[in-house]
Amino acid sequence: MKGGDNMNNVLMAFLLTLLAGLATGIGSCIAFFAKKTNKKFLCVSLGFSAGVMIYVSMIEMFQTAKESLVGVMGIKAGNWITVISFFAGIAIIALIDKFVPEEENPHEVRSVEEVENEIEEYKGENKEGKADIKDKTLMRTGIVTALAIAIHNFPEGLATFVSALEGASLAIPITIAIAIHNIPEGISVSVPIFYATGDKKKAFLYSFLSGMSEPIGAIIGYTLLRNIFNDITLGILLSAVAGIMVFISLDELLPTARKYGEHHLAIYGLIAGMVVMAVSLLLFI
């Protein structure tokens, strides 16, 4: 591990994980002040995030994991454990995705207009219902969404943290990529709560708290693993994190990017993300 025992690296890793989590609060602010989503920008940004995650996962993290494991366990065992860990990471995030309630699934990224339209449709369908019942239901939707996103963000926090321990060349682009994809999640939390309560501060608070599961995930992961952190642990974690990020990219970011813009815009964003990640890694050789 490159300076893994260096406390400065650990502090930087926590800071970057915290910044990625805070992006849900940015999404909340956008929901309050933006009446229309720039869908082309959203499309390119999500494609960019996917490009960063896929490139760094397959080119850097997987290879680093394999080197760590092969160096300790030998070629055959090291390669097998690397591959098993990669698909274990995919399985973990897929299970979390499966058991999150479908209607509050954070993978279904929505624009400001979509969330507001859904709420207006809901109110229209329930005109005869009492206002307090409708508001309570909207409040519940926002809270359940916040909890769903918090659960989903937990392994992402560990992913950001582990990548940050490997150095700035990995950490900064991944932090930016995860932050970009956290912004629409903040919108999904804050809009229903704001419509239910009329309180921007409360809506922002719930959005903010849902994002804090990322640094919490990092803290818990580091606390549990710090005493057994070695080349084997590092290799398994890096490979699993690579699997998590590939799944997020293919299951969430790319489909959503294509949904909100032209197919080619998503691909251009994807390629740009890969180029930025490649240059970032080359600069730190």
Curated annotation (Swiss-Prot):
Zn(2+) binds at E156, H181, E185. The chain crosses the membrane at residues 13-33, 41-61, 80-100, 160-180, 204-224, 228-248, 265-285. InterPro entries: ZIP, Zn_transptr_ZupT. Fe(2+) binds at N153, E156, N182, E185, E214. Keywords: Cell membrane, Ion transport, Iron, Membrane, Metal-binding, Transmembrane, Transmembrane helix, Transport, Zinc, Zinc transport. It catalyses: Zn(2+)(in) = Zn(2+)(out). It is found in: Cell membrane. GO terms for molecular function: metal ion binding; zinc ion transmembrane transporter activity. NCBIfam families: PRK04201.1 (NF003243). Mediates zinc uptake. May also transport other divalent cations. This is Zinc transporter ZupT. The gene is zupT.
